[in-house]
């Protein structure tokens, strides 16, 4: 079954989950360093997740560095949580992971978009220019092979965007 993204509804998502035997949903967001991050929830929680979102500690936006500790008086101090609100138009059954689907989420603090979430900012910029916001995540992928010993390894050992790869 192919989803019509112009007509996707929570009911259609729930039906797809049942028909495709989806067990897990990945809720994905892009951080300020353009790294895909996310949370995983069981598919049985889809109704609750779509109605109320999921929570994430605000400190998770700090960069995951030991030097980025929760310090009072900063945006990442003990302020609570952001709410991840799923964008149902981005629902996709993942063909490369068994029984798993994914959706992009937007981050909210209370009822306002979180100031470090790039999606609402881009949507606003595009609206000011007269454009419509339609964007997804660029997935990274790897080509692998099985070695003679049966070990899965990279097909190519050269680094991407490195001059070393140009000498192959």
Range-by-range predicted roles:
Residues 2-168:
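Glycine-rich, acidic/polar active-site loops that bind/position phosphate-bearing ligands
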């Amino acid at each position: 079954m192919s989803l019509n993204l112009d007509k996707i509804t929570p009911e259609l998502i729930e039906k797809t989950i049942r028909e495709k035997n989806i067990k897990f949903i990945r809720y994905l967001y892009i951080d300020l360093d353009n790294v895909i991050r996310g949370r995983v929830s069981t598919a049985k929680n889809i109704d609750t997740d779509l109605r109320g979102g999921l929570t994430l500690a605000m400190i998770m936006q700090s960069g995951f560095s030991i030097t980025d500790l929760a310090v009072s008086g900063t945006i990442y101090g003990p302020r609570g949580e952001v709410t991840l609100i799923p964008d149902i138009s981005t629902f996709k059954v993942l063909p490369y992971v068994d029984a798993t689907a994914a959706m992009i989420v937007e981050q909210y603090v209370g009822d306002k978009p979180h100031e470090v979430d790039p999606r609402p900012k881009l949507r606003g910029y595009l609206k000011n220019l007269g454009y419509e916001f339609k964007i997804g995540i660029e997935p990274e992928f790897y080509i692998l092979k099985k070695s003679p010993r049966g070990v899965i390894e990279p097909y190519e050992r050269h680094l991407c965007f490195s001059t070393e790869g140009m000498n192959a």
